[in-house]
Amino acid sequence: MKRLLVTGAAGQLGRVMRERLAPMAEILRLADLSPLDPAGPNEECVQCDLADANAVNAMVAGCDGIVHLGGISVEKPFEQILQGNIIGLYNLYEAARAHGQPRIVFASSNHTIGYYPQTERLGPDVPARPDGLYGVSKCFGENLARMYFDKFGQETALVRIGSCTPEPNNYRMLSTWFSHDDFVSLIEAVFRAPVLGCPVVWGASANDAGWWDNSHLGFLGWKPKDNAEAFRRHITETTPPPDPNDALVRFQGGTFVDNPIFKQS
């Protein structure tokens, strides 16, 4: 494609995707509220507050695809989540509607379903069970995206990211790990598909201990290749076994279920 927008490009995952997604477009437009490293060849850097509708409109203009990693990615006071994940996402979808409806990869989260027990295997249509205000904001985001698809035909992949890290490093991640390579191959598949719609995609690698069923995604032609099982021995040898009553091994959202409702100081 001509120009691919990556929001949240200064974040931990955004910095990884900056390098990995460069071959997908002639120009990579990188955006974040935080300062970005200087633009390299075939890059554009934009400092943008998602809560500023005019800034978001300018950020989206001229883009042929969007990978939306921006916003708040952990549990925070509602006032912060509201600006980045609710107002900000509305601004993004309005900007996309005004600029030809480029296809969107929306970084949703496993915390939309965090209160499900780890004993359950989940398909894409299970009712939401968010484990905090962050998870609630991602439920909002998924529903906003579905409304824009039904009303305007805006296509979005709703990627419920598990644990997108270089390697799994705890027992829960043996089920939730999503390798960087598998995320990149998913993004490639989303933009390659002739028709996308607005599907839920469980953002996880091909983990033997996985809880999530992506069998509905045959039309994408995407198959994750990595498997957290390769790291099980290292985890068991270096990590004390968790208490069976610990949220880390009881709930799919892990310790997020233990978070309080944080208040703005």
From Swiss-Prot:
Optimum pH is 8. InterPro entries: Epimerase_deHydtase (IPR001509), NAD(P)-bd_dom_sf (IPR036291). SUPFAM superfamilies: NAD(P)-binding Rossmann-fold domains. GO terms for molecular function: nucleotide binding; uronate dehydrogenase activity. Its EC number is 1.1.1.203. Pathway: Carbohydrate acid metabolism; D-galacturonate degradation via prokaryotic oxidative pathway. Keywords: NAD, Nucleotide-binding, Oxidoreductase. Coiled coil: none annotated. The active site is at 134 (proton acceptor). Induction: By D-galacturonate. It is an enzyme of class 1 (oxidoreductase). Substrate binds at residues 73, 109-111, 163, 172. D-galactaro-1,4-lactone was previously believed to be the product of the reaction of D-galacturonate oxidation. Homohexamer. Catalyzes the oxidation of D-galacturonate and D-glucuronate to galactarate and D-glucarate, respectively. In fact, in water solution the substrate D-galacturonate is predominantly in pyranosic form whose beta anomer is converted by the enzyme to D-galactaro-1,5-lactone; in solution, this reaction product rearranges to the more stable D-galactaro-1,4-lactone. Makes part of the oxidative degradation pathway of D-galacturonate, which allows A.tumefaciens to utilize D-galacturonate as a sole carbon source. Cannot use NADP(+) instead of NAD(+) as cosubstrate. Belongs to the NAD(P)-dependent epimerase/dehydratase family. This is Uronate dehydrogenase.
